Amino acid sequence: MRTIPCNPNAQPEVEEVLDYLAQIEGKGILTGQHTQTMEQPEIWRIREITGKLPAICGFELLSYSPNIRRETADEECLKEVDENCGTLEKAWEWVERGGLLTFTWHWFSPIGGRDKSFYAEKTDYDASRAVIDGTPENEALRHDLDHMADILQPFCDRHIPILWRPFHESEGEWFWWGAKGPEVAAELFRFMFRYYTQHHHLDNLIWVWNSPLPEGYVGDEYCDIISRDLYTEP
């Protein structure tokens, strides 16, 4: 496993995490659990059964999207958003416990859309135009990225490394960022990388690419870790 961060200006804590992951490669694993609500029932169920907490806790940022159109949202969407509100408080608590963070963002489309507009079927937002400077789609993309950067900045200020996994499951067409194909999704990822490392200097992020498709790979210079979402039947 490569231990040199793809961001040449990455904070030392980023390299420390990558070094540790390299040291345990082939020898052990880190357990993790994704959560989405303030109650985090999954985490406490794990502790109830094992007496321990996982090493990694995943946090969902969907409610932090700036373009949530509540007037178009159904009851299920509103419930999901409301239950997710404030979960970054739990992320800070996890930091105080010494755990590792990973963030996922079901990003409501930057303009337009209705209901759960992170789904492609709920928006006409064109990801292929979002990477073209000067387009309304690009301006909206930058606006949302600035908004999220403000949320991430306090973690950067305290040198808290984050496994940052944007545009997840980009191999599929179900999210707006994957609807125009894996190459467009990869370009979105590269755009975010450049914007966050060169403009916002979020040097605490560990960049995680999430797709099994080689044709959609962003390149080693933009990615620290390759991941994949797998679902099994209950």
What are these regions (language model features)?
Residues 36-38, 62-65, 108-111, 168-172, ...:
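Solvent-exposed loop/turn segments at secondary-structure junctions
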Residues 16-17, 39-46, 86-89, 147-151, ...:
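Alpha-helical scaffolding within the catalytic cores
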Residues 7, 48, 195-234:
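Surface-exposed substrate-engagement region within the catalytic domains
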Residues 67-191, 198, 202:
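Substrate-binding cleft of extracellular glycoside hydrolase catalytic domains
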Residues 28-33, 54-61, 100-105, 162-166, ...:
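Structural recognition of the beta-strand scaffold that forms the well-ordered cores
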Residues 30-32, 51, 98, 201, ...:
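Glycine-centered flexibility motif
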Residues 11-13, 181, 234:
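Alpha-helix capping and helix-coil boundary motifs
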Residues 1-58, 62-81:
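N-terminal module-boundary/linker segments of secreted carbohydrate-active enzymes
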